[in-house]
Structures are given as structure tokens and as C-alpha cells.
């Protein structure tokens, strides 16, 4: 069943495999009249791209091309087609994986579902698919910027290390998108240890949105938080999502968790900017739990396509963690959810 | 924007307010030929209904009526309309709340979004809306039972108390749907303390599904886990969702979190039955963090509709926790997600 | 597959069978703040209801009840549930049809699709289903009236008789909704002849909408005319749809068919108010071809459920033509299409 | 609002403007395991391509590239991205049209809707957009061929000339896709007259589908005929759609129009293969009325973007009629509708 589209009014459809000729996205429903150039998108793609020290050495340039929907530098209201051609494709690295199921990956589930799979670098299930999401998110960002909405994602935990302080300016200064410089330094040391050990790690990404008006979200199934949860959980390595106080709220008392209302607004934001599925006007705050990358060089038990036991040690170009590359992806998903809701009119009739 | 429908093939649309004449659901896409009687639905409604000691004393009978889609005791493939008339409606209890915004509720966000709100018992944002979900879930259960799929929800944490053991048979023996009798007894004591204190609490609900075939879920946005996350987060009091190891996975190493594959299947289930968004054939395991019920008699700071500060102490019939009533609701949402995916054919062409 | 919903923003879901307990519709996405009373809906239902001389003698009162979405006389933005209980249900009339397939009806296709069918009066495939559409259309009409849009349907051909003149005031003065009094009188004589002959007839319904702004319709698949065509063709007896000059345009020259543009607007309206799928601001004009009612007392050849040949003469309460009852139904479908598009914001960004 | 997607299970999204860098389509939901090569698609594209004598002299090669969804020559179940780069783009031809609204085109409605338009060759509203539909239809054809379904479109009327005979083999032998060789010859003469006169013409296209099983179509809004009507009316120049006897049925008696049922099946096919919105198993027959191409060199009255009157004579490369190029497009739309319904399982539960 078709599952590669997201959004109702600001609607995207992504396509492409890790080692196919190209990948891309069609954005349908973007309003006309928004200035848009490839550089607007390229900037965001650079933030998730491999080639940095932390991430895999695949030197993919990730040049985006705009194939439709923009005329004389401005969106026209028709579908915007973005494409990124895959240039550094070395499928040869993967031929030995054609007949083995990597633990923690979708190799076996894809084969069970489709009866066939593209085993080159994970095919459609590769993290590379998220480049298309980031490209679409960049377009959503342009639209939202014009409405005063700003979205920022950052790392709040990595390999069990947590941030202790929050400095917004620090986020783009370190390779972890971490708002705490001290924590970032510790994370860097942790990466080296894990690389030496042939192992990998996960972490927690937080996304916050400023400037959203009250009133976004549609009861009862398309609540703002429901859509955010679905959006973030659709990102490959994400295994948990929470809004505001999240899982901590489960252990709080009502008198602790309720955000008091004052004539100046809410006195706290345990709600994470969402009440009854509708935005309150406070910052929207969501967090995503990211599992460790399953590709490790440490030996693992698995089976091959004939069902025989195999000991597998995955070589090749792999990251130690989906963080930091997943950070701009989480940001993109929140941008896309908000763009979708922001497109809807305030439907109140004048009386 | 329309937001009261859920699902693509097994599609439900709910309607109704807490203190309106009735509430209900239309189930469109349920296969024909399934025996269905009101009692099949009534049984599940009883599990979430008020009137038990733990929950609010509203003595609503919640009698479901089947108005369409069933002929001679069997579904016909046409829409099934279920309705529950509200009989014990005392809106008078709420008139004093018509001009005040209750903290932690949707009173203010609804008014900001719609410019008008039904203040009787929360109107559409009331937990009562979930009766329609449970009714629809009961129909999904009938369909899934014929395919060998079984879904069960239970409480794993309540007011900071956690279960230590798991006994499936115990779940329906205590009012908390708790699989640990000792923990259930402690929870019961906690309820009394909170009621005396005029406060409320939350908890964590786990849902597990047995018997699902591998192959459910549609990459990349309609992944099984993405749909589960959106479904559970759409339930009123839920602020977090996790699959399998969930947030714990964020602090694990790849070598710990990966589920090894053996000739006999997966050796563990940190994935919670989902890899790359597609079911593995293992039990599907999801958890939802439930916030404390915001209606408490303990005094709170808030404002009225004129923006003036008010100290509010909420009287009337209110539960101490959304647990246990939310347990069958979480179960229903997972049933509905699975019914939707189970309706889709295995689309593989013979070669 | 679920197929009983229509519209994207102003979204309706209908349910109910001819001889079940009730039928109804859920309207999701209707803006808040619109005054709405049962009489607003009842008025439209009266226009399609049986009991008039022309139509079948089933004396169904068709009383609509509003079960949700309206508070203190005004829509709240939440789903509006409308129900009409079936009171004059004499299924006994149909028991002899349980084992025979009526020509021109859906008896056999429903059974082939679903493996089961509700044979009482056509079940879900009965024209009675359209009462729910008319009820929903009445709500759309209230919304559109506030935006200055007015929709009117009328009969332009009946049993081969065509209207020669157009008098808008005449439409509601004769039982055919015919804008030509002379033609209406001829139609009345034709009905008597056909009733005597035990036969039935069809005709053509035209729907025109005044006051629509330019800009409605979404290229390339959700064009305004594409949605109108799908909407009208979804009405049971409709076998053809055309916009503006329609089929006549197929035999015209470009120089004849093009509507010249002048500083005062379009000089003609062969386009029927739609160019490139987008409304022009001129009247929107659509026509639907209605086939003769298949239930006739004249003997017909058919087969029973065992495949044996049967000569069938259908007795009971049946209309001679779907006209006039189908006229308000076509009107409702156009109302629903326009409400859906009118809900969408003009998305142009200010530059 | 997003409007460039079509279908629910076999879902396509098209993009691209007449004179942009490229146009294309993403096909999401195509089953895995279907052999697919560029030539399978190229063959259908050739049938609609310009360059033949009848059509405009734009020598576009229309080479399709498959960018995703196919691995080792076989579909994988993931989205199939097809792209056609525009090579023969002479926008200069259109600069004089940047400030004038061509009658019968979408120039003015696009500008009214979006506030901006791509005036190069009609931009998104150009007939060139349909190349993407034909490419997607070719993939649907591959899928349907495996299920025994065959779809064929042909011209039954052109400039007021009608076919008198039907010879299936003749269809691909003449440039009109006309099943009557004598009529085709007359059409050819008519084209020359119109070209000399600087005028254009329309016609009627019929599409028939063989081999469809009974049971396709979803009551009550997604009826097979409703979807066909919406699909065909979404094609640029189409102004009318009919199924089976269509508009002629409006003047028939019930006793004439009903298709008698015999032990060997239906004795006639006035229904066009659809009863109550569900396929009967007979050939599905639909017709589309095609308006004359609005671009004519004969002088026309119009206005420019400043609202001033202009006499316009359109030069450049234009067809005399949308026929024959629209014939493969109508065929593609029916292929896409049928593929969508054929993907759905027969949902009957065994009892």
C-alpha cells in the first residue's frame, strides 16, 4: 500500500533507494509566491550530509536540483519536484550482504513483505532516504519563516550522556548539535571509544518550535501531538517519542503536572505546547529516542537467506550513531507537520 | 479541518460530545461475513465504563446500538454505524466552568481554535469520546480474531509504582488491569491517598499484540510503529509513546540492542516486533505514558474567559487517574491500527 | 475498501440501509459558528421525500435529528452527526426478491463483491441512501450562504421531453423541479402513460451555482470539474455528466467554443464556469444524465440466485422516475463539492 | 491544496511544467515482482508524442528514465520515480503571451488562484502534463496485464464526424486511433480544412476494458463509475463523461435500458459494465467529450493582464485537435483507476 506520502495540505511524497540512480521528493500544496532557490535547500542538506569526521566517509555531494514548481525564483503553487542524484555509489561494498540479514535492519522484514529487496546499502530502508525529508523540510522552513515560526532540533542525550545546560548558540558550533559544550566534548570522547570497540550508540533528540499560534491540531485523531508522534516515529532509528514532560508526567501528580494559567499566560510548559491536541501558543517541545545504529563491526549472530546461522562483522562506511545526522531529519519532520497545520485557515465564521 | 477519522482501509469516524444527546462511530471498510452482535461490543465498553469504585460515579449505562452494516447477524461490508445515547447527563455540574479555563484541559485551546466551545464536561475533548473508539476496537477485534491476532493492554506503572512481575491471567482480576497482583494492591492504596489529597496521578500502559504476521507496515511514513505512535498519542491523556526497548534503547549499545537472528527466529525483542517500520512476526509491544488527570479538587491558579485570575477547585464526578479507563482505549487503538494493515493484501506478484 | 466518505476538508461519511433501523451522516470539518437547527435540514429533506403523487407511496416522515456538533444553536467545529430513523419499514414487500436479481439494480454485483447482501429494498444500494447526502448538503448550503454562494438544481429533460424556456421561479412550483411550466405539464402526462404501461423513464438534471469566486479547484487531479463529475456520477442512477457545453463542445469549432474575454468579463459561458479545472467566477453549470428506474412492473427476464431463468414483474411502491427525487440529491452533491473547495484558504503569500 | 495525486492504493503523484527542466511521476503502491523496463513505458509515450503530422511540430523525444523502485529489472514495491527531461524547450515562443490571457485556457484562472503563473506554454496547465499520466498508465498496464485486464481507447467522433463501424485492429493503423478506416479518412480531410481555416475541433474518445472481474468499485462515493468520471474529467480538454448508454439512457424507457440477465450472463450492456457502482464482469465502457483546442490562429477577442481588450491570433506549434494525443491519456486514466481497484483484496471472510 502506498506509504511514501506525508501531510494533507502541505503534502510530500518521497522516493529513492540508497544506491539507485537518485532520490527525491515531490512537494504538493506549497503556497505560491515564496522565493525559493536551490541554496535554500542545500544549506539544510549540508547539515545532515556524510563526510564529516563523526559520520560515514561516503563523500556524497548531495546536490539538490529543483525540477518544477518554481518560476522566476518564486514558487508557483504547483508541485515542487526536488531530486538528488546519487554519485558516490559503490554497491560492491554490499554484495556480500545480498544473502545475509543484518540484525536490527529491515533486510528480513522487507524480504518478507515484498518477496524481493534491493540489498544495496539498505535500499529504501537506508537512512539515505531522509535526505529527501530534509530537502522538503527546507521548503517548509521557508514557508513557516514567513509566518514567524522557527523550529530547532538538538541532541539532549548521547550514549547515556545527558546535557546539563542549554545554550541555543552552541547548537551549531559542535558536530553533535548539542546545546551544552561540555557534554559535546564528552560525547566526542565517547565516539572514539565506541569506534575502537566496533560498537555503536543512540541518544535523544529534542525539537522545539517557537512562534506557533494557538489553535493548530485537529481533534480527535489528527491532534498536533499525534501527528508529531507519527512523524518522528517514522524516522528510521526512532523508537520513542514524547511531548513536553512526556514519560516523566506518568509519575507526576496532577498538581505538579498541570500548567497554571495566569493573566500573562501559562506559568510552565509541561504540556509541551499542546493541550487536548491543539497548540497553546507556548513553545512546542518534542523528544525522540534514537536507537544505536545496528551496523557494527563487532561480531553478531544472524542467519542468511537460506536460514543458516552466520557470524557477521559489518565492514564498510558506517556511522557510530544516527546522531548527529538524524537531528536535521527530526527538525524536518516537525517543520513538515507545522507547515501542514499552518496551511489550514482559521475556519471561524464571523457572527 | 476534518480530523475525526482514523485508518485507511479499516476506517473509523467518531463523533459526539460528553454531554450531547449521543456519541458514536461509523466503521467503513470492515469486511463482510463477520458475525457481529451488540454484545460483542458491549463487553469491551463495560471494561472502560465508569461506575466502578476507582472511577467517577457517573452511572452511564453505555448501551451500544448497531444502526447499519449488519444483516441477519453478519457484517455486510457496508458502513457499520454504532451509537451510544447519553442518558446520565447532568450539565448543571459544569455551568460554573462555562467561564473558566481548567488547567491541563483543552478549554482554552478549543476556544482559541474554534471561537466557541461546548463547556459541558469538556465537550468533544472529554475522555468520554473514547467510548466510540472502544466500540470500534471491539469490531476490529472480531475481525482480527478470525486472523489469529490477539491484542492485550495492561498497566505497567501507576503513580510511580511499577510492576515487578507479569501474569497475563491477573490482568482482568484487578481494577487496574495490572499483571502484578502485589503492585495492584499498592496501587489501590495509592488511589485512596490521592483521593484524600484531592490530587490525581498518571501511569504507563503497555499493549502487546500476538499472532501478527511479518510484513505489516508501509515504508516510509506509514510504518507500523509510526502509525502506532500516532494512534496512541491521539488518546487524550497520552504524552509519550515507545516501541520495544523505546527510550531505554537510546542509552544502549548496538551490540546490546540488536536482536540476534537464529535459525529459530529472533533471540530477543528489543525491536518490539517492528524493524524498518515492518512487523517481524514477534509480539508487537508499545507503551504509552499517561499524564495525571488535570481535574483535581486541590486549588489551582487559572484565569476566566475575561482573562482575570481565578483560584479553582474542581468538584463533581472525576476519576483519580485516567488509568484504568484508558487501558481498553489504548488496546482499541492498537486493534484499529492492526485491522487497517491486516486488510491489505500481500501484494507480491507470482513470478 | 472504505468508500462512504466524500470531501477532504468539508468531509462527510454516510451510512445506512434502506430497511435498517436508521441512516445518517457525519459531517467533519464544518466551520464553527454557523447557526444550525433541524429545520434547516428538514426543509431540504422534504424536497426529496416520497409521499408526493409522483413518487412512491412509502410514507416515510424522514425526521432528522442532530446528535452532535451543535451547541446552543451554533456549530462548534466538531463532527456533526445527523440521523434519520426508518419508521415505515415493510421488508416483507421484498422477501420474494431475496432470491432473485433485479435487472438494472446492484443485487448481483453486491452479492459478487461481498458474498452477502441485504436484499431488503436494495439495502445500501437503495436510493434511500441519498437522504443522508441531502441532509449533509443542507449543512453545506448554510455554510455557503454565508459566503454568497447559491446552488440550484432543476430538470431540463424527462422521458425525452426537453425544456424550452427557463424561469427560475417556476422550479419550485411544479413537482418536477422544472423551470418550464409547459414542459412540466407535458411531463405530468408522460408519467401517467408510463405508470399505466408499467414502465419507467429517466431524464437530465442541470445544476448551476452562482456567486462562486474564481480560483476554486486543484490541478491536476482534483480539478473542480473532475470533482463535480465524480460527485454527480456517484449518485445511483446517473450515467453521464457534462460541464458547460459538455458533449456538444465535442462537435464545435474552437472559434465557436472559446468564451471571449472582454474588459467586463467572459462574453459567454461554454466553459460552464471552469477553465483548466479552476473556477472562472462565472456560473458553474453541470448536467447529469439519469437513467430510467430499473424497477418496473412490466415483465423482465432475469435469473435467481441459483442461476435459473425467471420472469420478473416488480410490484410494490416504486417511482416512475428517479426524477424529481434525484434533483435535490444532485444539488446536494454540488453543494458538498463547493463547500469543500471554499474551505481552503487562498494560499497566496504576500510579497 | 495538494491536488496532483491520484488513486488510493495504486497512487500516483505527477509534477512538472510544459517548459520547465523536466516532468515526471511517482508511483507509490505498485506491487513488487513486476518486470519493468524503460521500453515498457516508452512504447506508450510514443503513442501520445508530438512530431507526427497531425500534431504540433515540437520534436520532443520524451525519453523516460526510471530513477527508483526497480531493482534487477523487477519492481520492488517501493515508489517508482519516472522522469522525462524537457529538451526542446523554446519558451521564447511564448514571451508575447506573458501579458495576455488566451481564451479557453487556464491563463487567467491560474493567475487568479495563485497570484503568479508560469506563462511558458501553459506551464502546469499544459497538455504536456499528461505525459506523466501516460507513463504511470504504462506501469498500471503491466500490472493489469498480469491479471488479465486489457484497456483500449479509440476515437468515436471527431469534428462532428462519427464512426459507423468498429474494427479493433484498425485502431492502431491510422493516426486518429479510429476503429473505422473510412471515418479516419474523412477525419484526415477535416484536419486539413481546419488547419487552413486556422481553427480547431474536438471529438469523443471511448475507452473499453476487457477482463475485469465483477466486484470492483466501492459504494457509495468511490463507485467504479464515479472514479472513472472523475479520472476522465481531470484530463484537460474533457467536458463530459458517460458510462455505457450514458446520456442516451436519459431518453430510454426502463424496459429498454435494463440489461436482461440470463443463465449465460447479461444479454446487453447498457450499463457499461457497472451496476450500483460495482463492476458486473462485462466490458467497462466509458466515453469522454473532448472540446476543441483553444489555441487557434483565427483572431479572437481577449484581454491582457491590465484588463485592456486585445485581438489575439495564436501562432506557434499547436495541434488542430487534442485528438489523437488525448486518446492514450484517456486510456491511461482508466488503467490507473482499474489498477487501484484491482489492488484491493476481495475482503470476504470465510464462514
From Swiss-Prot, chains A, B, C, D:
Pathway: Metabolic intermediate biosynthesis; chorismate biosynthesis; chorismate from D-erythrose 4-phosphate and phosphoenolpyruvate: step 7/7
One Gene Ontology molecular-function label: FMN binding
Required co-factors: FMNH2
Name used for this protein in its record: Chorismate synthase
GO cellular component: cytosol
Organism encoding this protein: Syntrophobacter fumaroxidans (strain DSM 10017 / MPOB)
Binding sites annotated in the UniProt record for FMN: 124-126, 276, 291-295, 317
Binding site for NADP(+): 48, 53
Alphabetical list of SUPFAM superfamilies matching this protein: Chorismate synthase, AroC
Subunit organization: Homotetramer.
Keywords assigned by UniProt, alphabetized: Amino-acid biosynthesis, Aromatic amino acid biosynthesis, FAD, Flavoprotein, FMN, Lyase, NADP
Gene behind the chain: aroC
UniProt record similarity statement: Belongs to the chorismate synthase family.
Disordered as annotated region, ranges: 39-60
Record field: catalytic activity: 5-O-(1-carboxyvinyl)-3-phosphoshikimate = chorismate + phosphate
EC annotation from Swiss-Prot or TrEMBL: 4.2.3.5
Disulfide cysteine pairs (residue numbers): none
InterPro entries membership: Chorismate_synth, Chorismate_synth_AroC_sf, Chorismate_synthase_CS
Amino acid at each position: 500500500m502506498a506509504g511514501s506520502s506525508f501531510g494533507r495540505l502541505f503534502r510530500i511524497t518521497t522516493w529513492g533507494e540508497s544506491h539507485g540512480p537518485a532520490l527525491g521528493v515531490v512537494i504538493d500544496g506549497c503556497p505560491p509566491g515564496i522565493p525559493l532557490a536551490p541554496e535554500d535547500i542545500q544549506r539544510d542538506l549540508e547539515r545532515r550530509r556524510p563526510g564529516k569526521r563523526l559520520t560515514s566517509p561516503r563523500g556524497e555531494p548531495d546536490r539538490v536540483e529543483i525540477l518544477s514548481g518554481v518560476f522566476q525564483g518564486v514558487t508557483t503553487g504547483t508541485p515542487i519536484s526536488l531530486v538528488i542524484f546519487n554519485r558516490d555509489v559503490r554497491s560492491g561494498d554490499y554484495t556480500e550482504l545480498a544473502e545475509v540479514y543484518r540484525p536490527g535492519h529491515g533486510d528480513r522484514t522487507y524480504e518478507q513483505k515484498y518477496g524481493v529487496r534491493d540489498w544495496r546499502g539498505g535500499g529504501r530502508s537506508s537512512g539515505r532516504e531522509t535526505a529527501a525529508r530534509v530537502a522538503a523540510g527546507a521548503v517548509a522552513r521557508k514557508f513557516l519563516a514567513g509566518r514567524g515560526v522557527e523550529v530547532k532540533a538538538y541532541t539532549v542525550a548521547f550514549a547515556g550522556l545527558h546535557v546539563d545546560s542549554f545554550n541555543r548558540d552552541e547548537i551549531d558550533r559542535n558536530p553533535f548539535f548539542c546545546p551544552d559544550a561540555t557534554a559535546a566534548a564528552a560525547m566526542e570522547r565517547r565516539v572514539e571509544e565506541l569506534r575502537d570497540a566496533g560498537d555503536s550508540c543512540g541518544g535523544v533528540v529534542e525539537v522545539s518550535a517557537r512562534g506557533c499560534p494557538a489553535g493548530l491540531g485537529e481533534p480527535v485523531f489528527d491532534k498536533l501531538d499525534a501527528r508529531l508522534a507519527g512523524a518522528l516515529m517514522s524516522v528510521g532509528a526512532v523508537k520513542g517519542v514524547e511531548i513536553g514532560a512526556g514519560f516523566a508526567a506518568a509519575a507526576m501528580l496532577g498538581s505538579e503536572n498541570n500548567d497554571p494559567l495566569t493573566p500573562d499566560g501559562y506559568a510552565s510548559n509541561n504540556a509541551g505546547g499542546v493541550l487536548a491536541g491543539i497548540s497553546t501558543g507556548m513553545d512546542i517541545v518534542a523528544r525522540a529516542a534514537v536507537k544505536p545504529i545496528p551496523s557494527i563491526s563487532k561480531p553478531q549472530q544472524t542467519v542468511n537467506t537460506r536460514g543458516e546461522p552466520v557470524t557477521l562483522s559489518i565492514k564498510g562506511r558506517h556511522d557510530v550513531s544516527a546522531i548527529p545526522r538524524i537531528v536535521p531529519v527530526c527538525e524536518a519532520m516537525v517543520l513538515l507537520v507545522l507547515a501542514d497545520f499552518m496551511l489550514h485557515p482559521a475556519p471561524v465564521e464571523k457572527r
